[in-house]
């Protein structure tokens, strides 16, 4: 098992243990995940795919992740990472090998860079701002989604609990 997948499994446990400050959808089946990857033109890294299958979309202690989900109002349209990635490509010229996974709160997107796959099949986590084409100037937040998301959520839960 990879480091990113182990971290994603720990994040699933963290969300389940803190259900009073977490929300999530029902999760995505294999067909929905495949449709999302097809629309984006690339596969999700394993650590992100695991969380999408488990939760679809989720938030915990104020940290919100796009994930992949559908609503009755929007029908079969895939929302979350799919809709936001396609919108950023169309409206802002986001490179086609990036996948949006969350908003950074300052006008940018936290993205997975599929052009830099590691030996475990994971993509690094970067911040992309509209208009930025140079990868070297993008802030790197982590080596894989699972480790990045678990660390972020663990800190958020600790801060939340300490403020009670």
Question: Model-predicted segments: where are they?
Answer:
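A short alpha->loop->secondary-structure connector
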Residues: 116-122
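Acidic, proline/glycine-rich low-complexity IDRs
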Residues: 143-164
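A surface-exposed partner-binding patch
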Residues: 1-109, 117, 159-164
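Compact, glycine/acidic-enriched structural inserts
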Residues: 127-133, 137-149
């Amino acid at each position: 098992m990879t480091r990113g997948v182990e971290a994603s499994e720990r994040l699933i446990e963290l969300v389940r243990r803190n259900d009073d400050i977490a929300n999530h959808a029902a999760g995505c089946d294999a067909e929905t995940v495949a449709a999302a990857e097809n629309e984006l033109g690339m596969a999700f890294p394993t650590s992100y795919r695991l969380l999408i299958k488990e939760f679809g979309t989720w938030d915990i202690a104020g940290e919100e992740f796009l994930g992949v989900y559908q609503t009755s109002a929007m029908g079969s349209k895939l929302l979350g990472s799919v809709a936001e990635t396609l919108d950023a490509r169309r409206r802002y010229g986001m490179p086609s090998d990036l996948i949006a996974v969350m908003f950074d709160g300052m006008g940018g997107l936290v993205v997975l860079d599929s052009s830099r796959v590691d030996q475990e099949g994971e993509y690094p986590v970067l911040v992309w701002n509209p208009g930025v084409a140079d990868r070297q100037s993008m802030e790197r937040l982590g080596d894989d989604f699972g480790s990045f998301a678990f660390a972020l959520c663990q800190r958020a839960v600790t801060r939340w609990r300490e403020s009670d």
